[in-house]
A protein has these predicted regions:
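Adenine nucleotide-associated cytosolic modules
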Residues: 1-191
Length: 191
C-alpha cells in the first residue's frame, strides 16, 4: 500500500514493564488482544503519549470497535470504566464466527488507513457493535472525552503503573502464557 510505512512485529507479552519500550514511536496502535487488562494498558499508554489507537474485539457472532484519539474522543476507560467481572464470554466459552472477526477487522483496518492518511473528517467517532448472526448494528457516541474519566480525564493511569488486575485470560482451550525464564547473573545457558 505504501512503501514509507514501517511495520515492526514483536513477539512479546505487553506488560506495564515493557509497554513504553514496545510501543514507543508508534503513530497508531491496532488492538488484536484477547483481554481487557492488556487493552486498558494500551489505553493508558495511548492517553499518556497522545497516540491514537483502535480497540477491536470479537466473540461469538458479534464484534466491537472504537477509535480512540486522545484529547479528541472518548477513550476506552470513558466507555468501559472497569473491567468486566464475573462470567465474560471468551472464544473458548462462546466460540467465534469468522465472519464477525473479518467484519470488525475490516472496519478497524479501514479506520487505521483513514488515520494514517489524515482523513480525520471521515473517522467514525462511535463505539460500533455489530452482530452478524442477528443482523444487529448499534453505535454509542464516543465523540468526546469524559472529564470524570479515570484515564483521560484524571490522568490516573493505573494499568501503565502496574496497578491493574494481574491476571490475563487467554482465548482457546488449554491456552498458556509462557514468560521468559530468568537466570541468575553469570550462569551459563543450559545445554
Amino acid at each position: 500500500f505504501n512503501s514509507e510505512i514501517v511495520i515492526e512485529p514483536q513477539v512479546a507479552d505487553l506488560t506495564p514493564e515493557n509497554a513504553e519500550n514496545l510501543l514507543a514511536g508508534a503513530e497508531i496502535i491496532l488492538d488484536g488482544t484477547d483481554n481487557f487488562e492488556t487493552r486498558y494498558l494500551i489505553n493508558d499508554f495511548a492517553v499518556k503519549n497522545s497516540v491514537s489507537w483502535i480497540y477491536a474485539a470479537a466473540v461469538g457472532s458479534y464484534g466491537v470497535t472504537l477509535n480512540v484519539i486522545p484529547g479528541e474522543t472518548a477513550c476506552m476507560a470513558c466507555i468501559f470504566p472497569d473491567s468486566p467481572t464475573g462470567f465474560v464470554e471468551t472464544c473458548e466459552t462462546s466460540g467465534i464466527l469468522n465472519s464477525a472477526v473479518n467484519l470488525i477487522a475490516a472496519v478497524a483496518a479501514t479506520e487505521a488507513v483513514k488515520m494514517l492518511v489524515g482523513a480525520e473528517q471521515k473517522l467514525r467517532r462511535t463505539l460500533l457493535s455489530w452482530d452478524v448472526w442477528q443482523n444487529e448494528r448499534a453505535e454509542l457516541d464516543a465523540s468526546r472525552p469524559r472529564s470524570e474519566c479515570r484515564a483521560c480525564g484524571k490522568r490516573d493511569l493505573i494499568h501503565l503503573a502496574g496497578e491493574g488486575r494481574p491476571h490475563i485470560t487467554l482465548c482457546g482451550r488449554n491456552s498458556v502464557q509462557i514468560h521468559e525464564r530468568h537466570r541468575p547473573r553469570g550462569r551459563a545457558e543450559d545445554p
